[in-house]
Amino acid sequence: MKNIIIWLLLIALVSCSDKSEVNYEISSVNLLKTVSYLSSKELQGRLGGSKEYFEAANFMAKEFAEIGLIPFNKNSYFQNLKVEYNQILPKAEFSLYKDRNFVKKYNLGKDYVFRGFSGAGDINAQVVFAGYGISIPEYDDYKNVDVKGKIVLAFKYNPSWNLEGVKWSSSLPREKARVALEHGAIGIMFVSFPNDEKPQEPIGSTMHGNGEQVNIPQIHINLPVANEFIEGSKYTLKELQTKIDSEKTSLSFALKSEAKIFVETEYVKEKVTVNVIGIYPGTDEKLKDEFVILGAHLDHVGGQSGEIYFPGANDNASGSAAVLEVARMFAKNELETKRSVMFVLFSNEESGLEGAEFLANNLGFDSNKVTAMLNMDCIAHGDSIQLGNGKSAPKLWELAKSIDSTNAKLTINGTWAGGGADASPFHEKGIPILYFVTKFSYTHLHCLTDKVETLNPKLYEGITNLAYLTTLKLAKGEYEREVIAERVK
């Protein structure tokens, strides 16, 4: 980071001429061109730490270099960090058997997906329904059933109800898989709640939870598939959830079906990945060592088995392309700013905000030097703009709202307290945050359908322009860092 200060001293030459004239303008054409590449089959969903993620990172670093941003780390735009990594390798299989006889093979992507941190395995065994997959003294889905050498079918999430004085364990898949393994299971299948108004379809996800890797197959199946496994039992899946929820007691039993699951994985406990960071230097003698951070996560949830990939156009190729486009606005128009701007593309948001957490703790300077952090995540699908964290940084929120009121006028009033996603690690350090997102942005979240053609070009251009104008005002010194009004951990 010392080199940044040196670069700032060398490059930040104060000009007497007015450099406020804008020649390069934000364009949805340029934004969507970048999104199209980042969400392409070539980049296979940009799984953090993967070869394809590094292709995306190198592409963005090259763009940073071409517009003249200063590298964050000596001569590199990369900030290295180590993350847990898991890749689903070719070729996978998931099939239904009855009485040990093959019935049907399911389609990856349509009928099921592997959890991002699924273990490997080649198994064919009876399936046992185990409710919520919880095993604690006060409530035990495993107490009256033998799952040794079998495959567990469990609801993906924990109950919406509580028992007095009882705190549920984590509902993340690693914890449920760990519990299943401890009881002797050799695999686990997750299904969404059948009684939800819109039960969640299988989605790509690398969010796994704490603890060691659980090396058994872990898959998320859709409701029709789950019902085919339940078929022949006393209850339907809907009836099972209703009965368990109403009586608040476990109801587990062996099913009259078997599952064959084959999956190979490449698991690495510590794999190197990178944040991509470029600096636009400020010129004011007093303020140039202060930073405005504009960030978005570059990673998504990857692909599986060489058969499918999750494009991640809105999540978050849109935010990444917007960071690049705003950087171009500053650099190509040679805008003169008092503060410096740090343009950041984070790795591994999807597995737990790891890139953002790493940068927040390894800035190379006091975090009090960060005037504000602006985060862009899922900003191109929907119909309006929402600015998060307004309850924690009301002055910053009002500033952005006032800018929008004289421009696109797309912002709604709703906001929240706290950071959210990659903004959270910075919020926890007391840094004012603004979270740019769009209303109704999650229609295709982590789905195979999150493609560039689902995006709203006009909205996308508008929110990117708002992020640019807000960043510019902060960089010009028209906002002073405020004390966080409402802290959320």
Model regions and ranges:
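C-terminal motif of bacterial Sec signal peptides marking the signal peptidase cleavage site
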Residues: 13-15
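N-terminal capping segment at the start of a domain
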Residues: 18, 25-51, 67, 72-73, ...
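Extracellular/luminal Protease-associated
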Residues: 20, 107-217, 281, 310, ...
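Catalytic-core environment of secreted peptidases
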Residues: 25-43, 48-71, 146, 150-171, ...
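Noncatalytic luminal/extracellular "stalk/propeptide" segments of secretory-pathway proteins
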Residues: 41-159
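Soluble metallo-hydrolase cores and metallopeptidase-like ectodomains found primarily
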Residues: 99, 111-144, 213-312, 328-332
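Metal-dependent peptidase/peptidase-like ectodomains
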Residues: 105, 216-238, 346-444
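His/Asp/Glu-rich mid-to-C-terminal helical/loop segments that flank catalytic regions of hydrolases
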Residues: 328, 332, 443-489
